[in-house]
């Protein structure tokens, strides 16, 4: 269907501004001025995060625009979840190679479906022409003293992860021809890659229960060490305890391990908590409808020179000799 040419401001109005406000609108001032205005709620802190998605680096050129709209916001909501913060509002800046009305309609559908599900209001942004590039800044709130931070892991804490790890990386591998999968499994992998589900309800439930947390965006092997470095501790992780999907279990063992430990784009939560919190964490996972799995233990350092690193172990506790790396934007194919 042919559409009349879109100007910058007609594009913003048609696909974004008209859908920006809804029943969850809480901004003092939203789209239409030079700035939006947000009033912090009493007793809460404002949590702010920004993520950029670039074609060819974070998503494929043939991605469904509806899925891309979803993922553009999802990866930012995942950061709020990792802090135990509830979503509140977001801004969107995008460079578009062309003003394609059908593409924009689908993209905004995916974006706003997720925004409405989590009560997150679009309050501003920017558009320009150029190679496809998307940037969201998200705002949330968390009670003072309850935020989950990377520097709060303690000696003796359990290490947990939500959901399963590795399906998104498995999907990328199938698309690239690195390995093969059955038709059903390949579809599940691609869905994990393109439709990540931010664990917002779980993150909010963990605030005040867990000690440290982050979202697994660059692979467990790349992300867990951030907690260890910031908290000045080390960790033992049972590789066999790391949760995997039934689809991932159909792939060769070495591929499973690579995807679970090194793969990115999982957007699950990795967090630590005292052993006394196990019942509360299981209950939080059940309320959020998300499986939670204990995979290891935080250990204190015996000496200041000890490595703040993960010791990967098998089910018997024996250390494994593994060379693992998380995703790095400047050292990735």
Show where each model-derived region lies:
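Residue-level signal for inorganic ion chemistry
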Residues: 37, 76, 84, 122, ...
């Amino acid at each position: 269907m042919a559409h009349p040419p879109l100007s910058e401001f007609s594009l913003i109005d048609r696909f974004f501004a008209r859908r920006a406000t809804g029943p969850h609108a809480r901004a003092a001032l939203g789209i239409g001025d030079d700035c939006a205005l947000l009033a912090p709620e009493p007793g809460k802190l404002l949590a702010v995060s920004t993520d950029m998605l670039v074609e060819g680096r974070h998503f494929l050129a043939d991605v469904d625009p509806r899925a891309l709209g979803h993922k553009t916001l999802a990866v930012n909501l995942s950061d709020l979840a990792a802090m135990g913060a509830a979503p509140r509002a977001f801004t969107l800046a995008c460079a578009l190679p062309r003003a394609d009305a059908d593409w924009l309609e689908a993209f905004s559908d995916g974006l706003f479906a997720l925004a409405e599900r989590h009560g997150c209001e679009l309050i501003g942004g920017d558009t320009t022409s150029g190679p496809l590039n998307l940037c969201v800044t998200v705002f949330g709130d968390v009670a003072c003293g309850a935020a989950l931070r990377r520097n709060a892991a303690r000696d003796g804490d359990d290490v947990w992860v939500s959901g399963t790890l590795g399906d998104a990386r498995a999907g990328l591998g199938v698309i690239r021809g690195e390995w093969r999968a059955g038709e059903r499994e390949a579809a599940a992998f691609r869905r994990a890659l393109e439709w990540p589900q931010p664990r917002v309800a779980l993150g909010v439930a963990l605030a005040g229960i867990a000690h440290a947390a982050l979202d697994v965006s660059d692979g467990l092997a790349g992300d867990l060490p951030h907690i260890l470095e910031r908290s000045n501790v080390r960790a033992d992780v049972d590789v066999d305890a790391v949760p995997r999907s039934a689809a991932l279990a159909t792939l060769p063992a070495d591929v499973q391990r690579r995807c679970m430990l090194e793969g990115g784009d999982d957007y699950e939560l990795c967090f630590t908590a005292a052993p006394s919190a196990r019942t509360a964490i299981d209950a939080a996972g059940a309320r959020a409808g998300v499986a939670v799995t204990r995979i290891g233990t935080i250990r204190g350092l015996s000496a200041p020179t000890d490595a703040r690193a993960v010791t990967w172990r098998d089910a018997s506790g024996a250390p494994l000799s593994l060379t693992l790396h998380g995703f790095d934007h400047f050292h990735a194919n």
